[in-house]
Amino acid sequence: MGDRPWQQQLQPHDQQAASCSVTAGMMMQASATSSSIHGNNIIRKDPGGGYDMAELDHIFLYLNSQDQASAAIQEQPQTLNIFPSQPMHAGEPSPKGSSSMAAINSAPSNNALAIAAGSSKRPPAAAAAGGQPSRLNNPADQPSASGKDGKAAVVKKEGGGGGGKHHGGASSAAASEHEGPKTPDAKTLRRLAQNREAARKSRLRKKAYIQNLETSRIRLSQLEQELVQRSRTQGAILGGGAFSAGIGGQSPEAAWFDGEYARWVESHERMMAHMRAAVEEQPQHGGVAAAAAEAQLRQLVDAAVAHHGVLVELKAAVASADVFHLVSGTWLPAAERCFLWIGGFRPSELIKVST
């Protein structure tokens, strides 16, 4: 009971060490006492076969200390204390504390040796008298040591449990990191579906655009072929040299006018030949034959005038497309071009008729 004030001043780490040393001292004391009991057992036996009460007390104390030591060892779990409840690097104890710890560690051994020596020297009556104080003192100190051991075991259990929880959380986080890719949620799936639909529509639009381009190209080639065919047909209608003249540098309208004018000149020459023949065949004397010849000549003159109207229409048509070709006079025959070069004017229809 005299050791309790300085025990309360120790730090938790020192208290735990002190409790462990006290327990070890008690075990050594009990073992020494039990050895002395067994050594003197044969000598102390009375003729009646009974044992001394002090010896029984020492035996019970030894058995209780063995049970408590085994229970304290079993209560400590065989686990790795990752997060200890006590600081790992405690401060250095003071010289006073170190001396007190040395005194604590040496006191149980000295007490055990003294008790063993006294029990071997004293008679049975003195041993019985000396056994009573040990029975009164040791059980009072034993519960405090066992209580401290229990508290330390509980603290270790709590620390081990906390470390296990932290270790479990770390292992679960590592397992979640090493797991495969998680399945996407509904929002991601909806976005992926929208992207696929947009890509499909884009491909369809591109295909339709390409088809339109191909159709336009085919239509353009068809129009070009139709235009070439029409040009060839028109050239065949206008004359053999019309299309070649148009290719040589003239416009299509100028080439068409040249062809039409060439045909008009041919028909005009035939009409002029018929008119000359009618004039020559006209009779000198009047009569029925003279009246018929005059009527025929009038018809030929009316046809020639109408034929000149066709030429005017042709000139009007080409003037709206290529007036410079009409003014230059390249479409005229060589004789008319000569008159234009000499006099700077165009011969009248009267000169044409007369010639």
Curated annotation (Swiss-Prot):
Residues 83-104, 118-188 are annotated as: Disordered. Residues 118-134 have a biased composition (Low complexity). It is found in: Nucleus. GO terms for biological process: defense response; DNA-templated transcription. Belongs to the bZIP family. Interacts with NPR5/NH4, NH5.1 and NH5.2. This is Transcription factor TGAL9.
